[in-house]
Structure formats: structure tokens, C-alpha cells
Amino acid sequence: MEAQAVPEGSGPSTASPRTAPPVTVLVMRQDEAEADGALRPGLAGSEAAADAEDEAGDDDADLLDTSDPAGGGESAASPEELEDEDAEGGGAARRRGSKTCTYEGCRETTSQVAKQRKPWMCKKHRNKMYKDKYKKKKSDQALGSGGPSAASTGNVKLEESTDNILSIVKQRTGSFGDRPARPTLLEQVLNQKRLSLLRSPEVVQFLQKQQQLLNQQVLEQRQQHFPGAPV
């Protein structure tokens, strides 16, 4: 490319007192134009190659982002989302395993139930139910023990006392034609005490003296009735 200065209005017959400023004209040679055309496709090809590399890098990044993490099979999520999922899962588990009190009007629930099929009742109403059952049982017993049953109980006691008296009389007297009744333990003890007292020396001497006195009285009576009878 060469720059040539060409004066305006040049010619042999033109003459002016003031000289016009020169105009610069760019003239491109054929070899320079061909070189410029050869450079432009190269630049376009390099730009296309750079764009292709950028797209390939984006695709690789997408593949890396969508791939499974090393720690598990689920996609990465924020801590807030994980906490929300855990809370929802825990709530669903509690709804599946929770039991509501069967007492009418009570809304207390629990998840600590050993047997899911059996009905559950809270501690307050369970104790209340036991107390009501106990009071009802006591009232039924009180109602059943009054009235005719009390009279029947008195009759039973009277019959038992009569039977006891008859059995005691039979033991002491015995029936006709039967052997004598066996003495009771108290009677046996009294008989043993009586025998031991009779065998004591003091009682023996006293009895001997009494016997002698009786003998003397009998002799005196005989002498009075029969004066000449021998003693």
C-alpha cells in the first residue's frame, strides 16, 4: 500500500495564485489485498475454534454439574432444603407412628407406642378410668350387701351358732347307744390338776383325818343306839 499526493485541479492550463492542500489517496496493491484476504479467513477460523472450545468447556461443566456426587446418589442441595426435607420426613414418620388418646375429647398424642394395633390412652385418663372402675365395684358391693342379703347373712350366722352348740353338746353327752363323748382338752387338763392335788401329802393327811373323824362318829352313834354292843 502506498500513499500518493495528488494536487486538485492539476492541468497545464490551470493556474491559481493559491496552492490547494494535497489530498492523500490510499492505493492498495494486489499482493497486499491478497495477503489481507488470506489473513481474514485465518482470523475467522481461529475465532470459530475458540468459540467451539468455549462451548465444549460449557458442555463439560454441565456434565460435571449433573453427575452424581462422590458421597451419594442424590443431587447436591442447600442445607436449608435438606433441613426442610428432614423436617417433612420426620413429620410424616410421626404421623404414621403416632397414636391419639381414645378418651372422648382428648387430643393428646404420642409416638412411643409398643403395639400399634392396640388402642392407646393417656396417663391422666387411664388413671381416671381405673378409679371409676374401682368406685363402681365398691358401690356394687355396697348395694349387694344391703337389704335381703343382710338378713340372709344373719340367718346364716344364727344357723352356724346353733350347729356349734349342738356339736358341743353331742361331744359332751354323746348319743344314746354310742360310747361316751371324748373329753375336751380343757376337761383333760382339769382332771390332771385334780389328780395331782389329791395325791399331794397335805391332801392325803387331811383326808385321813377326815376319815378317822367319820369312823369315830359312826362308832359313837352305834354305842348310843346299842349300848351293850361291842366296839
Swiss-Prot record:
Task: List this protein's GO terms for biological process.
Answer: positive regulation of DNA-templated transcription
How is the subunit organization of this protein annotated in UniProt? RFX consists of at least 3 different subunits; RFXAP, RFX5 and RFX-B/RFXANK; with each subunit representing a separate complementation group. RFX forms cooperative DNA binding complexes with X2BP and CBF/NF-Y. RFX associates with CIITA to form an active transcriptional complex.
Q: Where in the cell is it found?
A: Nucleus
Q: Which gene encodes it?
A: Rfxap
Question: Does the keyword DNA-binding belong to this entry?
Answer: yes
Q: Name one GO cellular component term.
A: RNA polymerase II transcription regulator complex
Q: Which InterPro entries match?
A: RFXAP_C_sf, RFXAP_RFXANK-bd
What is the native source organism of this protein?
Answer: Mus musculus (Mouse)
Domain of life assignment: Eukaryota
Question: What role does it play?
Answer: Part of the RFX complex that binds to the X-box of MHC II promoters.
- Tell whether DNA-binding is among the UniProt keywords: yes
Q: Where are the compositionally biased (Acidic residues) regions? A: 50-65
- Where composition is biased (Basic residues), the residues are 115-138
Q: Which UniProt keywords apply?
A: DNA-binding, Isopeptide bond, Nucleus, Phosphoprotein, Ubl conjugation
**What does the PTM comment of the record read?**
Phosphorylated.
The protein depicted here goes by the name: Regulatory factor X-associated protein
Locate the region Disordered.
1-163
Q: Where is this cross-link: Glycyl lysine isopeptide (Lys-Gly) (interchain with G-Cter in SUMO2)?
A: K157
Motif interval(s): Nuclear localization signal: 123-138
